[in-house]
Amino acid sequence: MTDYSTLMHSPGSESRHQCLIYNGAPSQKLSLLARALQTKLVEGYRCLYLNSPPMVAGMRSTLASMDSDIAELVKDSLILSSDTVSSGKNFDSGVMLGKLEDLLDKAIKDGYKGLWASGDMTWEFGPSKDFSKLMEYELGLEEIFHRRKELCGICQYHHDTLPRDAMRQSLLIHPTVVINETLKIINPHYLKFKWPTDINTNQKLDKMLAELCKQ
């Protein structure tokens, strides 16, 4: 059973560790993510966007349509990547978390306020689609958010491509849920239940997931 005690007694990650839960075409969320990314660039953060090649191309186009100088941004401030840690192998949460913290350290060393990162969970876990380490990864990520105030970002959970348990877990480990470009809500299920959850809890989580997917 997953133990949240360390996280519950450490300083909160406030709204820096956010979750975007949705269904339908991922391209429909490009504008939302591009606005969030652009805001963080203006605030002085280096930004990382991790997704499939078509989605990375879509992000480039979306940012360009917002009058962002993509060529100049990609040189330093913005990292658009389709690289996966798994590369066909089993997902290694330790390697992924280590790379993320290395990028954060480098951003600070280069004079940025910190690192904003957004990754699609389906893409991050690679073609094997083995999500058995998802909770371990998210708990490790949340621990970094507690420890490193310079880190912020949005985890993307696509209902159409992730198993139900993965979607349920998304509601247990993110303090804030992104609704649209202007609205975010406090997640009422954050660190409230231990995993695996019982039938009654699953029903509560599934109800909220269904409501979020209507947005």
Task: Name these PLM-found stretches.
Residues M1-Q215:
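Non-catalytic regulatory/interaction regions at protein termini and inter-domain linkers
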